[in-house]
């Protein structure tokens, strides 16, 4: 299973991207966006990860589905982490 794979290999960008596609097909757009962000982060493209996570925040805010609460919390936490990494990355350039 892809979810098990990304837990074991969190830097596997391809697995995250495949998981994103599967989640989109399963009508889980918020989880799909987070998986896409994780794929970007695995490629060290933290700015793109921040962009995807912000899109996820916007989607969560506008979603009538309250079941997305836990995923929204994960997105908020990961966004802070990615913003910090993006800032460090920009400082090194």
Label every PLM stretch briefly.
Residues 1-25:
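Alpha-helical adaptor scaffolds
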